[in-house]
A protein has these predicted regions:
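Catalytic strand-loop segment that frames the active site of acyl-thioester-processing enzymes
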Residues: 1-57, 141
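HotDog/MaoC-like acyl-thioester-processing domains
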Residues: 1-14, 91-141
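A generic structural signal for short beta-strands and their flanking turns/coil linkers
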Residues: 12-14, 18, 26, 36, ...
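Amphipathic, positively biased hydrophobic alpha-helical segments used for protein targeting
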Residues: 24, 42-46, 64, 70, ...
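Short, intrinsically disordered, mixed-charge
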Residues: 32-36, 71-75, 126
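Hydrophobic beta-strand-centered segment that forms part of the acyl-chain substrate-binding groove
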Residues: 50-54, 64-104
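A solvent-exposed, acidic/Ser-Thr-rich amphipathic alpha-helical stretch
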Residues: 60-61
Length: 141
């Protein structure tokens, strides 16, 4: 694959982030969209009996926040742009309703021959607790 000149608009260490307070509306809305109706997310009584002691957000919601940040990074590339195509994420701690999380990406590696940017990805809560961590991949078109 030929190297795209648009790769030059990305530099190692480039970063972006997105913060959001997770609400009941977010958890119910996400459940309705993706069909994740598991009790630990939607049923307070059920959740009280779990190791978490209260309701938690779906893990994939944290991946969605990372996708928002990937959109910020993709927007840096001039037309025809860039797209995210891979998320390797591990969930480290629960996100509770009312938590304010920050999804952050830092450009860690550029694979020029594949027109790919690889980002270190993290999601932390308001106390600095790491709730999700991994890598995300952006293809420059």
């Amino acid at each position: 694959m030929a190297r795209r000149a648009h790769m030059d608009c990305y530099a190692l260490g480039d970063s972006s982030q997105f913060s959001k307070t997770v609400s009941e509306y977010d958890v119910y809305g996400f459940a309705g969209i993706v069909g994740d109706m598991y009790g630990v997310h939607l049923d307070e009584e059920y959740a009280k009996g779990t190791q978490f002691g209260k309701r938690i957000a779906q893990g994939a919601l944290s991946v969605g926040f990372l996708a928002t940040v990937m959109g910020h990074m993709a927007a840096k590339a001039p037309s025809p742009g860039a797209v995210s195509y891979r998320y390797d994420v591990t969930f480290k701690a629960p996100v509770f309703l009312g938590d304010t999380v920050t999804a952050r990406l830092v450009l860690a590696e550029k694979e020029e021959d594949r027109n790919t940017c690889i980002f270190d990805a993290s999601v932390t809560n308001q106390d600095g607790v790491l709730v999700a961590q991994g890598k995300t991949y952006l293809k420059v078109l």
